[in-house]
């Protein structure tokens, strides 16, 4: 099993959108894929699959607090694909509780091992909370690869430098994904500058898309609804490179 974390230093850069679409593409290619929402502060993945789960259904929060086995959290959002989703709780009380965690986050390590043994996945994708904190470092430590998602602005650049350094100290391979870039940006030049500045590869670059932004307002998977779009082709290339 290859564990891939999607992370960003700042919120709102499209990290969850990338995670959901990549998980779908990997599963559509026949790869057994688990997508786990470890962004306990602001969970979002259920929206992309338009799941209507009962609020009492177990989530990752329940596993981390010892209230439920991790295997009971797994759901299959698209029945004809080998894709499994482990959602985080969207209950307001649980999101507030996550700000002052009362559980041992190292329990996640045991959960990952149990998922590997029970489901034998090819890929486990972790949609991580943005920023630098104890939970993000723990999640990074279980990964083989980190996709650090950023936008083309100074604050993103500074924060990304920090996160790339953390990944290297944890001996986890970092790759960059530039998202929502202005349409007039010279992407080849920016790619060269990013790779030189951070000394790591740029795995993909995506320009701003009004179509994707509009879909984000109602939910759904962009690559599933727009398989021939240019962004979908770049997402497919990124998925194949993993």
Predicted regions: what is each one?
Residues 1-3, 241:
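Acidic-aromatic/histidine active-site loop/patch
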Residues 3-69, 123:
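Walker A/P-loop NTP-binding active-site region of P-loop NTPases
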Residues 40-116, 216-218:
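P-loop/Walker-type NTP enzyme "switch/lid" segment
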Residues 51-55, 166-167, 192-195, 220-223:
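Short, hinge-like loop/turn segments at secondary-structure boundaries
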Residues 107-205, 213-214:
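Conserved catalytic-core segment of NTP-binding enzymes
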Residues 216-235:
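C-terminal boundary of histidine-terminating zinc-finger modules
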Residues 234-242:
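C-terminal alpha-helix
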């Amino acid at each position: 099993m290859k564990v891939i974390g999607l992370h960003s230093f700042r919120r709102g850069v499209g990290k969850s959108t990338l995670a959901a679409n990549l998980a779908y593409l990997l599963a559509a290619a026949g790869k057994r894929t688990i997508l786990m929402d470890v962004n306990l502060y602001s969970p979002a993945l259920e929206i992309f699959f338009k799941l209507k789960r009962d609020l009492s259904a177990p989530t990752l929060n329940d596993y981390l607090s010892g209230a439920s086995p991790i295997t009971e959290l797994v759901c299959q959002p698209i029945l004809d694909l080998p894709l499994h989703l482990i959602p985080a709780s969207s209950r307001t009380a649980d999101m507030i509780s996550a700000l002052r965690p009362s559980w041992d986050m190292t329990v996640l390590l045991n959960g990952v091992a149990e998922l590997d043994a029970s489901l034998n996945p090819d890929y486990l994708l972790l949609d991580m909370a943005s920023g630098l904190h104890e939970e993000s470092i723990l999640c990074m430590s279980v990964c083989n690869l980190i996709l650090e998602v950023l936008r083309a602005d100074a604050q993103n650049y500074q924060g990304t430098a920090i996160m790339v350094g953390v990944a290297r100290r944890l001996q986890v391979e970092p790759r960059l994904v530039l998202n929502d870039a202005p349409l007039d940006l010279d992407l080849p030049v920016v790619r060269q500058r990013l790779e030189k500045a951070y000394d790591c590869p740029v795995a993909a670059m995506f320009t701003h898309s009004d179509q994707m932004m509009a879909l984000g307002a109602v939910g759904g998977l962009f690559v599933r609804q727009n398989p021939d779009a240019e962004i979908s082709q770049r997402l497919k290339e990124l998925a194949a490179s993993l």
